[in-house]
């Protein structure tokens, strides 16, 4: 309890001086998911018009205590796991898609001569502080120095395990890629953190043309955003859809289950690949509002009409109360129940998959 109070006080005191300067990242027209001040999920419109709150740090902590009283503390990896790191090719010019799993929600996607990173995090701690927070449980599947020239970086939202500033700074210094993210995030990165990125902000349903044969769309997700203690829902979260000549790719970012998977399928018909989160789902009463369980990830896979799905967002950072192995165990159980075999897979960190 003392540790919890100490962490809260440190975060609060560090955040307080920047409350008035950092809580507003976007000013634009009111929409069905923006009330002029804050963004909200379409499915809980009524609640969000009244309040920008979804239940925060204290709500999670109380839920965590109650969960541990019944189930005990989660069994988690206490030493960092090493793997054989993959060395990717410089680029892929043929008609194939190369997918390399770096860990958590970070993938290297290589297609049509482009190298794309999703939600890159190479830090050892997913936190505003380098000394406290969720620690990395497994090394990145590709050494940073072995990354090919990165052309595009997709950032789904502002949480620390998805928008990792130390990694973004390293990518900018080495590659100067194009960053693509939701409304308000470029303002934060460039105006509040002075990173001088080539950065494009997208609203839901917006797209940006990368080349004649490749578009990147930003689509609805069910989540939220925040940096430090303040600025809740001041920037937009979402999923990315890469529309290419070799097929459509869906990157879910962080999301709870809702109709947005079916909405994407109605527009794009099918997906060659979907990257779907399966971790951070316990305690269910709190976490499933904005995260997928393995069962829900399988349903999302079906909703999207995905030919192949790869699991992500598990076994890298301890973000919730499931045991280290639970996401994979629960996914395999659900696959057996639904008779889904090789369409939804676990791609180990450091492994590469080629789709043709």
Task: Give short role names for the model-derived ranges.
Residues 2-130, 140-141, 182-253, 272-278, 330-351, 355, ...:
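Metallo-beta-lactamase
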Residues 12, 17-28, 33-36, 40, ...:
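Cap/insert and terminal regions of metallo-dependent hydrolase folds
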Residues 104-110, 210-272, 288, 292-295:
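Catalytic core of the metallo-beta-lactamase
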Residues 120-122, 158, 184, 221-223, ...:
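Active-site metal-binding loops of divalent metal-dependent hydrolases
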Residues 122-139, 224-231, 282-291:
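Acidic/histidine-rich helix-loop elements
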Residues 132-181, 269-275:
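Active-site metal-binding motif and surrounding structural segment of the metallo-beta-lactamase
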Residues 166-171, 192, 260-264:
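A short acidic, amphipathic alpha-helical/loop segment
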């Amino acid at each position: 309890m003392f540790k919890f109070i100490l962490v809260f006080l440190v975060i609060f005191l560090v955040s307080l001086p920047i409350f008035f300067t950092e809580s507003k990242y976007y000013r634009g027209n009111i929409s069905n998911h923006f009330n002029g001040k804050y963004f909200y999920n379409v499915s809980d419109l009524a609640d969000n018009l009244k309040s920008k709150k979804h239940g925060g740090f204290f709500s999670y902590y109380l839920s965590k205590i109650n969960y541990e009283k019944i189930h005990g503390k989660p069994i988690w990896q206490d030493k960092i796991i090493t793997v054989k790191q993959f060395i990717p090719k410089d680029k892929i010019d043929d008609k194939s898609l190369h997918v390399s799993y770096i860990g958590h929600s970070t993938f290297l996607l290589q297609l049509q001569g482009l190298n794309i990173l999703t939600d890159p995090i190479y830090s050892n701690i997913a936190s505003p502080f380098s000394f406290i927070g969720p620690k990395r449980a497994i090394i990145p599947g590709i050494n940073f120095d072995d990354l090919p020239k990165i052309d595009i970086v997709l950032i789904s939202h502002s949480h620390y395990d998805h928008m990792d500033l130390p990694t973004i700074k390293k990518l900018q210094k080495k590659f100067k890629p194009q960053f693509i993210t939701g409304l308000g995030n470029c303002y934060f990165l460039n105006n509040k953190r002075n990173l001088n990125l080539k950065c494009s902000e997208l609203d839901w349903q917006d797209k940006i043309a990368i080349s004649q044969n490749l578009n990147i769309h930003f689509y609805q997700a069910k989540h939220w955003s925040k940096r430090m203690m303040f600025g809740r829902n001041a920037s937009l979260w979402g999923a990315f859809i890469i529309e290419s000549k070799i097929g459509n790719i869906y990157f879910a970012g962080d999301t709870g289950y809702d109709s947005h998977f079916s909405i994407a399928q109605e527009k794009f018909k099918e997906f060659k690949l979907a990257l779907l989160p399966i971790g951070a789902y316990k305690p269910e009463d709190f976490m499933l509002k904005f995260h997928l369980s393995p069962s829900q990830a399988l349903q999302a896979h079906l909703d999207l009409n995905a030919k192949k799905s790869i699991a992500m967002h598990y076994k890298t950072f301890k973000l919730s109360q499931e045991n280290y192995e639970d996401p994979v165990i629960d996914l395999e159980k659900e696959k057996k129940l639904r008779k889904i075999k090789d369409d939804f897979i676990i791609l180990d960190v450091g492994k590469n998959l080629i789709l043709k």
